[in-house]
């Protein structure tokens, strides 16, 4: 039997035979994709057609050696600080993530407690109504009772989310909460209610969670027997269906009918998550299944309410020190609304913004000290890691040069950082006061937060009389929030004003300057309340009633003017935009273009750019030193795509291949081949400067592989039947 060809010693055949013969194509094993050429050393001294390359050693000059030593030190420092920034990012983001999880858990805690109380009260009433005898409980068939006893107690939990992505974590938290209270809990998703698996798949899923993971029988009697063993009957059985509206209606109806037949032997509580309305199951369940449900309604907090709670905990309370600029906040709000208000999309945006900040800003390592509550670590340790290059970068920041801070004030850097750390305290108090006033007009904290971040503070124009007239004639969407707050003050009742002042007093309790201004409003508030009480006296003459009405309106107007004055005082004195503070770039992410590119993405543009700069991706030294010159050691796909830039919309495959072949076989190799054929005496030469050129079949295979990769990435369109020798470019430029 003839030996087969190997990679090192390919059989000699023509290009036509190698591509047309099916036997050769199946049995001939050739490397058709080469990332970088391997060393051309002669392994074991027996491989033919491979020659050794001469290794040339040059002693570097002292200047080059010194320069390379400095570059290596700088490279080590850069790697050290890059690693350090990534570690600080993990610290900062872990604190932000934990804060968000705690906020979401607390926002649903009341509803979760209400669901558990409802389960316990209903379970105790079922037990007290009359427990089954042991002989009846262990029977393998349901007990015949009245129709009312076949009602399946159901909790309809309204999530008010358009996307299920936010509900997944909510129902996981609900499952953990009920299990911690001693309930037997199983959770089913909409995937379990498929028409293919039927109700048997649902029953098997329940038995695997309740009884044993290896159960493969869809028999509800197993559940009944398990419930009466090992004191399992002392706790209720809860089944959670997290996304009812996506379930197969007939399968869910069959499961409800089966479980209701066993409701006496196994007190089962069904929790159904709905996102649109409490009566959504009417659209998917059968009439018989609906009659078996005894529903109780529960409503979770809305996505906007959860968003406000997260925003308050992350940006307005001491958390990590990280914040965003005005433009970034506007983009995050727009992205949040475009993603159907899903909190998961906002958290994802926040994480990418935080990661981009640490990757772009060298001074972001200082944020680690902002994570420590009540600990002043910015004076010594925070500035020890600042190298000369980092310090130069710090004093070249736009906020530093704008405030005319020079390098001579280096010792003041810790004080500037401490000011950054203390600044959010009064700032956040004012934002929360505005939020309390905006609640009467259903304003969201996210809208107020975005407008207050405006570095130009255009909202202050609304407090001058001339600008008030202009604002009434020219609507400005940017200042809409503050205008709405001021307008709503005129429509508030005395009780609403009193409630707002009480909340302001609680918010500003630790900040005496603002708290004193709020306390000064109490006498005016008492006058308004007194005027309101006189207006409400019974049997008062119409003349006195009209006087008291005008008196109340006068007192209310005076009161609202005083409140507007306090709001103006808070905004002017304490609402200093973060982008106007020196060194704010340390903790504030401002590059909205980077964030937009990371979120929305431009995969085709990214692929094109990587192909044109492949030496940076592969860290190839030989390619990067030659600049834009094409070399045989480059990636085949990168070579082919760079050659495609020289063609128009339509590329001739033959010309493209010849250009590709020219790169892989330099002119020096061709000249050597000619010299070898002409001079027989130099046939046994074993050492040459360059390796042997690849075979024609190998070049064609590499060309086909590179063209296929460009087609998969969507950069070219393959030949058509009309023009089989041409391909068309789909994307242009980089």
Curated annotation (Swiss-Prot):
The keyword Glycosyltransferase does not apply. This is Origin of replication complex subunit 3. Follow a cell-cycle regulation with a peak at the G1/S-phase. Mostly expressed in siliques and flowers, and, to a lower exent, in flower buds, leaves, roots and stems. Induction: Regulated by E2F. Accumulates rapidly after cell cycle reactivation by sucrose addition following cell cycle arrest mediated by sucrose deprivation. It comes from the Eukaryota. Residues 1-25, 532-554 are annotated as: Disordered. Residues 12-24 have a biased composition (Polar residues). PANTHER family: ORIGIN RECOGNITION COMPLEX SUBUNIT 3. One of its GO terms (biological process) is DNA replication. Pfam families: ORC3_N, ORC_WH_C. Keywords: DNA replication, DNA-binding, Nucleus. It is found in: Nucleus.
């Amino acid at each position: 039997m003839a030996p087969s060809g190997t990679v090192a010693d390919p059989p000699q055949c023509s290009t036509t035979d190698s591509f047309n013969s099916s036997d050769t194509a199946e049995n001939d094993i050739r490397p058709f994709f080469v990332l970088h050429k391997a060393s051309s050393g002669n392994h074991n001294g027996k491989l033919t057609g491979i020659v050794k390359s001469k290794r040339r050693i040059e002693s570097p000059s002292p200047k080059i050696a010194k320069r390379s030593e400095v570059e290596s030190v700088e490279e080590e420092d850069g790697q050290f600080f890059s690693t350090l920034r990534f570690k600080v990012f993990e610290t900062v983001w872990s604190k932000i993530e934990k804060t968000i999880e705690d906020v979401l858990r607390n926002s649903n805690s009341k509803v979760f407690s209400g669901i558990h109380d409802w389960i316990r009260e209903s379970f105790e009433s079922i037990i007290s109504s009359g427990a089954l005898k042991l002989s009846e409980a262990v029977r393998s068939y349901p007990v015949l009772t009245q129709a009312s006893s076949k009602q399946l107690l159901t909790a309809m939990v309204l999530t008010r989310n358009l996307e299920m992505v936010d509900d997944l974590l909510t129902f996981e938290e609900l499952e953990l909460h009920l299990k911690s209270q001693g309930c037997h809990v199983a959770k089913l998703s909409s995937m379990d209610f498929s028409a293919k698996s039927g109700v048997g798949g649902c029953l098997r899923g329940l038995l695997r969670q309740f009884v044993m993971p290896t159960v493969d029988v869809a028999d509800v009697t197993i559940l009944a027997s398990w419930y009466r063993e090992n004191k399992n009957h002392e706790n209720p059985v809860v089944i959670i269906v997290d996304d009812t509206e996506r379930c197969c209606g007939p399968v869910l109806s069959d499961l409800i009918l089966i479980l209701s037949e066993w409701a006496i032997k196994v007190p089962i509580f069904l929790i159904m998550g709905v996102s649109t309305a409490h009566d959504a199951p009417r659209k998917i369940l059968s009439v018989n299944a609906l009659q078996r449900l005894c529903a109780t309604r529960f409503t979770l907090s809305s996505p906007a309410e959860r968003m406000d709670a997260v925003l308050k905990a992350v940006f307005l309370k001491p958390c990590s020190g990280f914040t965003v600029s005005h433009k970034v906040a506007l983009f995050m709000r727009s992205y949040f609304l475009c993603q159907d208000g899903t909190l998961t999309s906002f958290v994802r945006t926040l994480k990418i913004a935080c990661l981009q900040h640490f990757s772009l800003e060298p001074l972001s390592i200082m944020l680690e000290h902002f994570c420590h509550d009540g600990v002043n670590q910015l004076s010594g340790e925070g500035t020890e890691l600042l190298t000369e290059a980092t310090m130069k970068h710090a004093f070249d920041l736009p906020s530093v040069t704008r405030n005319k801070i020079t390098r001579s004030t280096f010792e003041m850097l810790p004080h500037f950082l401490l000011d950054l750390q203390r600044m959010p305290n009064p700032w956040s108090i004012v934002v929360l006061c505005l939020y309390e006033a905006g609640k009467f007009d259903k304003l969201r904290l996210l809208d107020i937060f975005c407008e207050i971040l405006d570095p130009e503070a255009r909202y202050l124009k609304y407090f001058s009389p001339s600008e008030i007239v202009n604002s009434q004639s020219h609507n400005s969407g940017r200042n809409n929030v503050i205008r709405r707050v001021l307008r709503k003050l005129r429509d508030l009742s005395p009780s609403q004003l009193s409630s707002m002042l009480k909340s302001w007093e609680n918010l500003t309790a630790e900040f005496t300057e603002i708290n004193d201004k709020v306390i000064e409003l109490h006498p005016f508030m008492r006058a308004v309340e007194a005027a309101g009480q006189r207006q409400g006296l019974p049997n008062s003459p119409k003349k006195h009633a009209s006087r008291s009405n005008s008196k109340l309106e006068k007192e209310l107007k005076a009161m609202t003017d005083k409140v507007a004055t306090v709001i103006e005082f808070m905004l002017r004195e304490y609402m200093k935009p973060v982008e106007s503070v020196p060194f704010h770039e340390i903790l504030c992410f401002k590059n909205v273009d980077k964030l937009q590119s990371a979120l929305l993405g431009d995969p085709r543009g990214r692929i094109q750019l990587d192909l044109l700069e492949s030496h940076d991706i592969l860290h190839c030294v030989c390619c990067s030193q030659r600049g834009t010159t094409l070399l045989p050691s480059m990636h085949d796909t990168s070579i082919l795509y760079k050659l495609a830039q020289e063609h128009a919309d339509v590329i001739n495959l033959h010309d493209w291949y010849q250009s590709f072949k020219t790169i892989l076989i330099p002119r020096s190799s061709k000249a050597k081949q000619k010299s070898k054929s002409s001079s027989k005496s130099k046939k046994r030469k074993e050492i040459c400067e360059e390796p042997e050129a690849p075979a024609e079949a190998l070049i064609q295979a590499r060309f086909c592989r590179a063209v296929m990769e460009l087609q998969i990435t969507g950069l070219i369109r393959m030949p058509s039947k009309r023009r089989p020798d041409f391909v068309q470019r789909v994307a242009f430029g980089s």
